């Protein structure tokens, strides 16, 4: 099973990625992890990546595609793989296709923006312990205070509404064309399949939808 997983920040993609990788016995591949591993391994491609990163440049799509081809040739990808965070753009999707990397399924975890803002902007954290609360879904016993220590809770920068909305706008501007690309591909060639899974509900309900989509 070769899967591309799409979903906005806060859509619950990480939870479903874990389910998919465990269910199908496939690795989760992210470009960030792949770049770091290549640099650490010191392969010819890794040295090229290191040179680009050390000079403050952006690693080109060509290099990333080469890394992907190298990565998916490894034994743990024999049964497939899950791409998380790649491709992000149409040129990357086209380069992936042109490189002969076949994909079985593109899965989008879809959640309304206002729901994501509510999920993320309502989070509060106890900095010292990492305990996480939510104003609506898991409130502390005393508003703004950690249950165990009574210390103040904070809101992380990433969880502030303005930041969340900015990240969502960026995601939509990048991903909407990608969604259209894969929907057209599915309609005209039948592969990869494209499924939009509703990401609202309990974790078990969403997981059941994902499982049904990939069946």
From Swiss-Prot:
GO terms for molecular function: adenylate kinase activity; ATP binding. The keyword Cell inner membrane does not apply. Signal peptide: none annotated. It comes from Azotobacter vinelandii (strain DJ / ATCC BAA-1303). HAMAP family: Adenylate_kinase_Adk. Its EC number is 2.7.4.3. Keywords: ATP-binding, Cytoplasm, Kinase, Nucleotide biosynthesis, Nucleotide-binding, Transferase. Consists of three domains, a large central CORE domain and two small peripheral domains, NMPbind and LID, which undergo movements during catalysis. The LID domain closes over the site of phosphoryl transfer upon ATP binding. Assembling and dissambling the active center during each catalytic cycle provides an effective means to prevent ATP hydrolysis. Belongs to the adenylate kinase family. GO terms for biological process: AMP salvage. One of its GO terms (cellular component) is cytoplasm. It holds the Pfam family ADK_lid. This is Adenylate kinase. It catalyses: AMP + ATP = 2 ADP. Monomer. It is found in: Cytoplasm. InterPro entries: Adenyl_kin_sub (IPR006259), Adenylat/UMP-CMP_kin (IPR000850), Adenylat_kinase_CS (IPR033690), Adenylate_kinase_lid-dom (IPR007862), P-loop_NTPase (IPR027417). Catalyzes the reversible transfer of the terminal phosphate group between ATP and AMP. Plays an important role in cellular energy homeostasis and in adenine nucleotide metabolism. Residues 30-59 are annotated as: NMP. It is an enzyme of class 2 (transferase). Residues 122-159 are annotated as: LID. ATP binds at residues 10-15, 123, 132-133, 201. AMP binds at residues 31, 36, 57-59, 85-88, 92, 156, 167. The gene is adk. Pathway: Purine metabolism; AMP biosynthesis via salvage pathway; AMP from ADP: step 1/1.
